[in-house]
Amino acid sequence: MPSDDGPAVMVALSNPRTEGALVALAGALAEHRGGRLLAVHIVTVPDQTSLETAAANRERLDRSSADLLAAAVDDAAAFDAPVETKTVLSHRGIEEVFDAARTNDADAVVMGYGGARFAGGRAEGSLDELARDLPCDFLVLDGQRLDAGEVLVPTAGGPSSDLSAEVALALRDVSGAEVSLLHVVDEGEAASGREFLTDWADGHGLGDVDLRVETADVGATIERIGEGYDLVVVGATERGLLSRVVRGSLASAAIQRLDTSVLLAERPSLRSLRERLIGGR
């Protein structure tokens, strides 16, 4: 059952190698929002294995899950946010993440790129529809560690860039990150671009960070400049980013070539939120 301890930031865990980075990100966001952290270990069971058979091996699964969730609790202790843990056995992979987010009334979900692709042993027919109707904010980290020393946030505005800004603010205020904003414009639009970025930064509580306005191709510019940062936070420019992630397409080719860690941010559209409230289409 959902708790009443403020907004819930759910972190979906499936790999011990990425647990620390995901909890560090989710913990910073939970503290920033004055909410709680929900660590969920989703154990994806192959289709050929029944859930009953998997449950019969529960002792082994419980040990593995207990170790992973204990590590999550330890890492979460660094943040001023209460933490809860859960383990779920499922054939449905990514669908289970959406169900858990809805069941627990999550305000945001943090997961790894590899975890976002755990589709179980079958093709998930409703995947596109599922990923285009997000139940809450989604953050997908491509990288096994989170170094929040220097963070770059490219922006052209929009709801998902608003989420990127909130994450950057959380990492700055909670984890001590140094944040830079990047806005890429066409030739001859540098002045208007700087005016836009200055106003955008002020409106998102980031008026004191480094502002960069570049005139070039957007993807190539993010690739070139992003290499100098520890983390690049990229907001979705259209609905369905998560659908592409699950199918193995991280983002643009330029983003995929980045050696640094990338955090993909997608915020539900107003239409999706309205549909959640009225329960229809």
Question: How should these model regions be labeled?
Answer:
Residues 1-20, 108, 113-169, 174, ...:
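Intrinsically disordered or low-complexity boundary/linker segments at protein termini
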Residues 2-54, 150-204, 209:
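Small/aliphatic-rich secondary-structure junction motif
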Residues 24-26, 96-99, 126, 167, ...:
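A short acidic, amphipathic alpha-helical/loop segment
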Residues 31-104, 114-115:
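Intracellular, membrane-proximal regulatory regions of polytopic membrane proteins
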Residues 77-109, 119-122, 204-242, 246-249, ...:
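Structural beta-alpha unit
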Residues 117-118, 186-191, 240-242:
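Short, small-residue-enriched loops and turns at beta-alpha junctions
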